[in-house]
Amino acid sequence: MKGFMINQLRAGLFMAATFTLTAGMTPDANAGGIALGATRVIYPQGDKQASLPVINSSSNNTFLIQTWVANADGVKSSDFIITPPLFVIHPKKENTLRIMYAGPDLPTDRESVFYLNSKAIPSIDKSKLNGNTLQIATQSVIKLFV
């Protein structure tokens, strides 16, 4: 029983050390990135628009941001207009999304929920490429209450 517990402790320490070393070896692990200015958007039904800041906290990465609204099934909704739907955000800059509802009347006795999607595609300097490269785009999804 004692040997089993020692092996469990060793395995846990090995996993923690491996994670710590791998995270430190990744060059952009702590470089920052794209953040949305809220965890949810509340769009009051009588208002013309709602706003959401998008922040690039990276000191050297530029991103292409694509945004859209989807319904509960994940299908893109044409009832919303987001400006700008596609834009470039430079390092240490901020942009504001404007979300406008242009669809039919929604129920007034309860909130309707939609999902705001924001995809961040990192730019790449082709002159610095040598060999294979893996580029990962991240997508954030937050709730949009109307």
At which residue positions do the language-model features occur?
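Bacterial N-terminal signal peptides that target proteins for export
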Residues: K2-A16
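Beta-sheet-dominated interaction scaffolds and their linkers
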Residues: N30-P53
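Asparagine-centered strand-capping/turn motif at beta-strand->loop junctions
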Residues: V54-S58
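Short beta-strand and strand-turn-strand segments in soluble, beta-rich domains
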Residues: L64-Q66, A70-P85
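Intrinsically disordered, low-complexity Pro/Gly/Ser/Thr-rich segments with frequent PxxP/GP/PP motifs
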Residues: S78-L106
